[in-house]
From Swiss-Prot:
GO biological process: protein insertion into mitochondrial inner membrane
Sorted UniProt keywords: Disulfide bond, Membrane, Mitochondrion, Mitochondrion inner membrane, Protein transport, Translocation, Transmembrane, Transmembrane helix, Transport
GO molecular function: mitochondrion targeting sequence binding; protein transmembrane transporter activity; structural molecule activity
Protein name: Mitochondrial import inner membrane translocase subunit TIM22
Role according to the record: Essential core component of the TIM22 complex, a complex that mediates the import and insertion of multi-pass transmembrane proteins into the mitochondrial inner membrane. In the TIM22 complex, it constitutes the voltage-activated and signal-gated channel. Forms a twin-pore translocase that uses the membrane potential as external driving force in 2 voltage-dependent steps.
Length: 184
């Protein structure tokens, strides 16, 4: 067994769950959950679920903003002539549809990207910026392939650039901390 990649020697055999104390059961459960969350299927599922939740909130917010503009489609102009109850029913129905649609898209994209990135990282056995860029390219091309090769190329470039920008931003905190609070 290893601890952060360092071999710690032979471990005692695992006891059956019935023979463990409550603390040992909790530690074993936490160990198994962490092991699952660090695996590729675990990362993929977590990215899909969190993308679904984030997409749902984003879709709900964007749908609520759609009724705020005075210039809109004929459907929005037509809504203002209906009674209040029908207006609310139509708006909430539309918000639910948009929210669900956005949630599905965010969840799907997050799941595909995370799965591809984890697979590339496992195959390369390296954790660097090229994993995210490659995963972004594959994900972008895969999502746009139905529209043709040019769209796949643009999708590849766009997702790779976005992934590079996000990775560069998230990895920029690796600098040493400032000497005092005034030099931030």
């Amino acid at each position: 067994m290893s601890l952060w990649g360092v071999y710690t020697g032979p471990q005692p055999p695992k006891k059956p769950l019935q023979e463990m104390t409550q603390e040992e059961q909790a530690e074993e459960g936490a160990r198994q959950m962490i092991g699952f969350m660090n695996s590729c299927p675990g990362k993929t599922v977590m990215a899909g679920v969190s993308g679904f939740a984030l997409g749902g909130f984003f879709g709900l917010f964007m749908a609520s903003m759609a009724y705020d503009t005075p210039i809109g489609t004929d459907a929005v102009k037509h809504i203002s002539e209906l009674p209040f109850k029908q207006q609310m029913k139509l708006q909430f129905t539309d918000m639910a549809k948009r929210s669900y649609s956005s949630a599905k898209n965010f969840g799907y994209i997050g799941m595909v990207y995370s799965g591809v990135e984890c697979t590339i990282e496992s195959l390369r056995a390296k954790h660097d910026i090229y994993n995210g860029v490659s995963a972004g390219c594959i994900t972008g091309a895969g999502l746009a392939i139905r529209a043709g090769p040019q769209a796949a190329l643009v999708g590849c470039a766009g997702f790779a650039a976005f992934s590079l920008a996000i990775d560069m931003y998230l990895n920029s905190d690796a600098a040493p901390p400032p000497k005092n609070d005034y030099d931030i």
